[in-house]
Amino acid sequence: MKKPVLLMILDGWGIAPADKTNAAAMAKTPNLDSYFANYPHTTLEASGKAVGLPAGQIGNSEVGHLNIGAGRIIYQSLTRIDKAIEDGDLYKNKELSRVMDETKQAGKALHLLGLLSDGGVHSHIEHLLALICMAKVKGLTKVYVHAFLDGRDVGPKTALEYIHELEDGMAQIGVGKIATVSGRYYAMDRDKRWERVERAYKALVLGEGGKAASAAAGVEASYAAGVTDEFVEPFTVDGVDGKITAGDGVIFFNFRPDRAREITRALHDEDFPYFARPEGARPVNYVCMTQYDATITAPVAFPPEEIKDTLGEVLAQHGLHQLRIAETEKYAHVTFFFNGGVEAPNANEERILIPSPKVATYDLQPEMSAEEVTQALLAELDKDKFDAIILNFANPDMVGHTGVLSAAITAMEKVDDCAGRIVRKVLSLGGSVCITADHGNLEKMAESDGSPNTAHTTNPVPFILVSEEQHKLHNGILADIAPTLLQLLNIKQPAAMTGKTLID
């Protein structure tokens, strides 16, 4: 009979002192409490440099699952680009150099578009300023910025700070003008709401939309109308003819793919059925900062790095059977991200997707689909089929994001109940359960002023090893989880995995 090793990821559960904002501590969790009391446990760093992000940067589910599945620190796009700027490699970047050189030779304009903030989730203003610097060094004189306003990864009314920082930077560097401004709601849609994308596109290509004397004046007018950064309607800046036309150079400096795809397709793709585009707007010399989609043919400045010997691959190499199971909200995380950004399953890797409930916000159903996930998993455990199981419970994170404390407490209590039933079953089979998380969230549901906190945290996450054998554990990082699981399965850790087992 197989003795399964199960990794249970309680998404969004960080460790923090018990207080009236810590939903995890306020919840009644008899099962988790008993594991902390009776089994070895430690904490893991899940943010900043420990997961390949800049120091102090909050972790997220994509980054967390990449690091867990890879068994090594995966340097995220933000860190890669930061490093390239620091080392001077950005200025030698093949695609960025090429597009700037060709644009200059053709006497055309260079357009830099992307999210204008230092949120570090989709983009960073420092990357934009570095590109403007590079354009100056390359001798380009027609450089236009198309600023997408944030208000989501940063405060809802912070755009003026970033506009002033950009304008000061351009003045110092000696090149660049803001040509258009649009809230990310329009320019960075990801839900195929093409009517939104079309409005941003028309500002970029036709100069249509609102008009303002300056970028700041347009934002101030929006504020006066009660419209915050994310929702600012696309407008052009008077006196700046920065329309994107055929033959121009275009660099989209966002590094996160999901919200960069639609506007990229509109500006770049030859076939585009979603709305009418004018003649003379294509082809442009387009460069994506990172790979937004394998089917987008535009050149990429920072192509993906291949991650070899992920946990899933190593299990497959040893002929082991593995199961990945989660509800919709976290299914991509236990499959695509856990496998190092690879869509196809490994040999003997089975997947179960449980639909997430169709509710407007998850505080309305904090249990989400945890019960259905649990029942499906218990049924699989009866089959004596799997050596390793990767399970994600979405509740702590998705309900944590709502900022509703009572709902987050309910979410945690439901997950505790499910965890108890799963652990009992695995122990009855002689297996082991590692309980952990990918980042913090629901342990901080409010700010010090009492306003809701809906964001992730930089808190460490727990790691509990529930098994018949008593082990000693030490502190670590998310990348140390895969080597630990391999040790429990008596499999040699591959050299590519630089994480270290948590077992002393």
Residue ranges, per PLM feature:
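Feature captures the catalytic ectodomains and active-site-proximal regions of enzymes
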Residues: M1-D504
